[in-house]
Curated annotation (Swiss-Prot):
Its main location: secreted. The keyword Kinase does not apply. Lytic polysaccharide monooxygenase (LPMO) that depolymerizes crystalline and amorphous polysaccharides via the oxidation of scissile alpha- or beta-(1-4)-glycosidic bonds, yielding C1 oxidation products. Catalysis by LPMOs requires the reduction of the active-site copper from Cu(II) to Cu(I) by a reducing agent and H(2)O(2) or O(2) as a cosubstrate. Belongs to the polysaccharide monooxygenase AA9 family. The gene is AA9-X282. This is AA9 family lytic polysaccharide monooxygenase AA9-X282. Has a modular structure: an endo-beta-1,4-glucanase catalytic module at the N-terminus, a C-terminal X282 extension, followed by a smal 9-residues (9res) motif. The X282 extension is a highly conserved stretch of approximately 30 amino acids mostly made up of threonine/serine which could potentially serve as O-glycosylation or phosphorylation sites, while five conserved prolines could confer rigidity. The 9 residues glycine-rich C-term extension could hold phosphate-binding properties. The modification Phosphothreonine is found at T20, T50. Pfam families: AA9 (PF03443). Keywords: Carbohydrate metabolism, Cellulose degradation, Copper, Disulfide bond, Metal-binding, Monooxygenase, Oxidoreductase, Phosphoprotein, Polysaccharide degradation, Secreted, Signal. A motif (9res motif) lies at residues 268-275. Its cofactor is Cu(2+). Cu(2+) binds at H18, H96, Y182. It comes from Trametes coccinea (strain BRFM310) (Pycnoporus coccineus). Its EC number is 1.14.99.56.
Amino acid sequence: MFTKLIIAASLAASVAAHATFQELWINGVDQGSSCVRLPQSNSPVTSVSTPDLACNASPHPSDGICQVMPGDEVTVEMHQQPNDRSCATEAIGGDHYGPVLVYMAKVDDATTAVGSSAQWFKVAEIGLPSSNPDYWGTEVLNDNCGHYTFKVPSDIAPGNYLIRAEVIALHVASSIGGAQFYMSCYQVNVGGSGSANPPTVSIPGAYSATDPGILINIYEPLSTYTIPGPTPYATTSPAVANTPYPTTATWNTALQPSTVPTAVPTPGTPGIGKA
């Protein structure tokens, strides 16, 4: 009964707590929404088989392409409402706990590429870095004013890419179709002279509705959490800061936070995700 009450409360709160990825930073420089395909609304996708899972449901087109180099620090930024970048409001609220994931896909033209036809490789993720107490990837966003920072792999081939930032909210994921997927696609051009072509997956296709990281009751005690999708390209498992959330986590090799932030960053400063 207690679990049912929690789930019911989460459903009620979720109506006002949806969110979208809206802005991009490159090496600490704010690009705003200049190269993002902004979703039509902040409502989630709930099917793992719909083409909308790639870049959201009929997002607004963009003719902007942001320029990045291999090794650049890229920050995706999420907020509940369009044009509201206030740090006073949670990036995604209503107990929308779950992982944050970032994918990339090489495409011929980032402004016209169809996300559901692209081939994606994961470059960063954060799930449940602490289970005592529970501390989710979405809380990293909330503690960093909606920011999550990763590095562009240092060896990928130059050209146009889509960057897909995603949150999977698990507050009502104890039944099939309950998980909520929030994603946006950013359009970038990667420079340099790399040649790597990482292993890829299709989206949709990378997830199953019964994956243990998608069909899950997060209100039961959890000691571990399996992040959906493939392993991030070029990963390692370093020890992370031992206070206040002692744990280890799988990260993109390029970016390891040296400390756990203790305060919410002020607007205008991209935060680096905690582990």
